[in-house]
Amino acid sequence: MARFKRILLKLSGESLMGEKQYGIAEKRLGEYAQQIKEIHEMGVQIGIVIGGGNIFRGLSGASKGFDRVKGDQMGMLATVINSLGLSSALGAASVKTRVLTAVRMEPIGEFYSKWKAIEAMENGEVVIMSAGTGNPFFTTDTGSSLRGIEIEADVMLKGTRVDGIYTADPEKDPTATKFDDITYDEVLSRGLKVMDLTATCMCKENKLPIIVFDMDTVGNLKKVMSGENIGTLVHP
């Protein structure tokens, strides 16, 4: 029995690189597809948002002289590339998908609407929502928060390369300790970088809980959905 009926799964674009320095690692993409297939077979309705940091990140582009709006638009297109890649991998695993885009680009994907996304999920399709919010100056964390709220998800699952939220960056501080659960207020007061401020406040105001977990360890997604105590729960 799945712990949640409908989820928004946020995936890191950078995680798609696997051991590579750029682009998409086919092995990692295949592992993600298999993990998603496992929970799809549990009857979970799945919406997905993927970042684009493995290809282009608008904010870093701006620091190198790109116009910020153009840079963010390039980042949006990077998320579409990743979404098509995941859609293809899921299709190869016999999972039906639908790619929706926040800006019109048929026939690459259908133009996003809340109702289209919900109808597709209720019909058993995995819905991959790409191109962020369609607007510059918004991160894919904010895009995933918005989509999670819109599709009335029970939870946002934020798949990362670390196994939860820590008091400090565990890759830099060996004394950092992990939270099993934490409130939004504490995340904000401690200045913990779970997501950007806009995304965190949106989830807090709309009472959308988040579970931050290590998606790169195969089998973890199913463990989260089965109710195992892994990752960190962020709640109102």
For the regions a protein language model found, what residue spans apply to each?
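C-terminal catalytic "cap/lid" subdomain
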Residues: 1-236
